[in-house]
Amino acid sequence: MPETDEEKVRRYTECLMNGIDPKRALKRLYDLNVSPEVFKSADTYQCVKRYESSPELAKYAKRVRDKLLGGRKREKGGGEDDADIEHTALKKAKKEEVNLDEEFAEAMKSGVSAQASSAPRATVDYSKYKVVKRVEVKVEPKPEPVDVHEQQASSSSMSYQREHQKDYAPVVPTCKPSGQPKKAIPQSKSLHADENMFKPRKERQKVFAGRRKRVGEGVSTLVSLCQTVLMSHIDMIDHVGIVPFDLLKPVLDHASTDQLRHILDVNPMLVEDADEMFHEMVSREFPKYANREKSGWTWREMYDRLVEKKQKKENDKLEMLTSRIGKSNSAQSQGRQTMVIDMAHTRVRSKSFFNTVKDSQVKMSATPSALQLSQARKNVKIEGKAQLRTITPRGGGVPSTSRSRSNNNNNMNNGLVVKKTAPLMAKCKKMLKR
């Protein structure tokens, strides 16, 4: 179904009311040919009037307004015709007065020209041109046509405009001019930031650490003064007598756990009231146990039990750590160690030989030193083999292979270990024999 003109008027009026593309809506309303009753039912005049103050949309709004007012004039007809007749009558009276003035001026000119030309003066009746006091005719301004619907909906539209003011239709403030001078607009501190930057440091505001002391805010009561003194000397609190708990509670809130226990031990009448303080301590340090129901125990006992359990757990953990650290240090201290041996082995043997030597507990003889060998080498030719045999260990000669094998086998059978000459020593002996 195509949209009717009435529906279009309502749709464009809603667009103007909500501020949705007002320029297009004003153009479409101007192009529509609809009776004024349709515009009146949709309250289009009020919506158009809002855009007359906008600099961009004032031209289109005035065109639509003139169109709406023109249609209403044609409807009213009779009442406005009477006003037009009165207005035309006033215009005619004014024109007649202007014509009389013009005739008088022409007559005066004609008289002057006649005297100059010395022509016979014509008889002119100047009585009708006698200047009298001009009657001032007050022309009343033409009253603007006021719509009946506008008067009815004035209150509702004004309230709606106040609640829903748009950015494109600013409200011009109506203020009466006053003779008093205007107050200076306070400037922000950021404008003077550059000026303060180039000033010396002495003029700048000093910065202090900590909280600002509250001095002179008000006169404190005697009770509050006493409480502040007690807060700074909690260790000196002893038996308080019949002082109510409400006065001591602000002081006890600042006390440590040991101080609170000492005060409660001295003043047993405060134990029941102070049990809630231990409940708060449990909820703060051990939140898992805060919602338990009391059954024959107090919150102080619960707190002491939990603290003891926590300390025991920490001590066990500390002992475990110390034992681990001690073990690690002892393991690190066992590194490479040097062993001092008094007597070196005569010959280099295999591991199996040393194991057998250990088992058989055979004593090893010391090898000859280099000095002894050098002396023996010098005296070989003189003293001969006898001296060399005295220096070298027993059996130092180089035996034959067959003989040595048979001797070894016999000795092994007897349970004795035969010492073999080292290859380097055998080589030295061969050289000495030569």
Curated annotation (Swiss-Prot):
UniProt subcellular location: Nucleus
Region (BC box): 221-230
Keywords attached to this entry: Nucleus, Transcription, Transcription regulation
Polar residues bias: start-end ranges: 151-160
Region (Disordered): 142-161, 391-415
Cellular compartments per GO CC: elongin complex; transcription elongation factor complex
GO terms under biological process: transcription elongation by RNA polymerase II
Pfam annotation, one family: Elongin_A
Domain F-box: 237-281
Assembly behavior: Heterotrimer of an A, B and C subunit.
Domain remark in the UniProt entry: The BC-box, which mediates binding to the elongin BC complex, has the consensus [APST]-L-x(3)-C-x(3)-[AILV].
Annotated protein name in UniProt: Transcription elongation factor B polypeptide 3
Gene from which the chain derives: tceb-3
